[in-house]
């Protein structure tokens, strides 16, 4: 009976291009204005559904339903997203419904689950059910980059008695596997052939496109060993050339079916 409201709220949240960027930090918005806007949108949904709302200095949104006893159980979702990247057939920030699917950046990861968490708790309110323990829906803002939102939250808030995230198939998936956030840097290569090389927008996304500029004329480039249909070579003049690789992007947690453009 509330499904259309759920879909409308997911669409409202998807409309915010909330890519976390600590370089655009401002008071109350440590990850930039677009993430703050998405957080305010989510908190507005929670308030409308009957939650008591607040936030941890813009790091984490907090939506509470009081319980009979001290302590609370919680869910945690996040309103930040990875960059949309190229290759979309639709506007990634205008949610569309197609053949039973919802299309848009963040529909699955993790704005849709965030909205569903809020509606799950709101069901208790709509039925006049007061839970034994309080229910808290946490709304993170930095899951895709560094999880600094959670660390900040725990500095001044008690841990829930129990918490799970709808950002996976709970309970089969119940923890982060971790990641390596290293950076490989090369010293300048004298007389090197590579002038520039670009590709990825985020460390946890498999890039769909990569571009390399070489100080080598097209006539001297070796023939591709594989995936020739995914490579485009064009001359730039003055003995230079550009190679454009077209892969199949995706989330790094689901590499099956993707083609890493950088590896091409």
Provide a role label for each language-model segment.
Residues 1-74, 81-84:
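N-terminal helical capping/dimerization or prosegment-like subdomains
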Residues 11, 43, 115-122, 151, ...:
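Predominant activation on well-ordered alpha-helical scaffold segments within soluble catalytic domains
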Residues 18, 48-56, 97, 194, ...:
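Short secondary-structure junctions
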Residues 54-57, 104, 137, 164-166, ...:
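General beta-strand structural signal in soluble alpha/beta enzymes
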Residues 61, 101-102, 241:
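Hydrophobic residues embedded in beta-strands of well-ordered beta-sheets
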Residues 64, 140, 215:
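Short hydrophobic/aromatic beta-strand micro-patches
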Residues 70-139, 145:
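Active-site metal-coordination/substrate-binding segment of hydrolases
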Residues 144, 150-264:
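Midchain, well-structured core segments that form catalytic/ion-binding scaffolds
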